[in-house]
Amino acid sequence: GDPDSKNAKKGQMLGQGGPDYTIAAEFKQELIHRKGALAAARMADQVNPRKESSGSQFYIAQGKVYTKDELNNLAARMGKQFNQTQIEAYTTVGGVPFLDYEYTVFGQVIEGLEVIDKIAAVQKDHYDRPTEDIKMTIKVVEQ
């Protein structure tokens, strides 16, 4: 999601590029960080208490599959409760439940979830950037 990543040199640190504007946070109960969720990156709460999203940077949620006990323990630590949609998603396809309603989710990978794991498994440099560029093509499908 960093616009500076296009044609970036090998080893160049990325993750700080983008426009000077942010987008208001938008949380919807049905849009959660299940595996494959497309979500907007943002600055930390300390400098961004309204949780406004980056104007261009995004990420794809990977996470893990949780047991019900793990979800219950996580919910207790967070002081929250997970709804049935979250429980179903995180105990089957997995994801990143602690990011729900903290970062705006705006889309979902609908085919090729296994590619997320392949991308996450490649060799990375000290900036956590793949040592070989991985080009993505994104197609918007409206429902």
Q: Which role fits each region the language model picked out?
A:
Residues 1-143:
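Cyclophilin-like peptidyl-prolyl cis-trans isomerases
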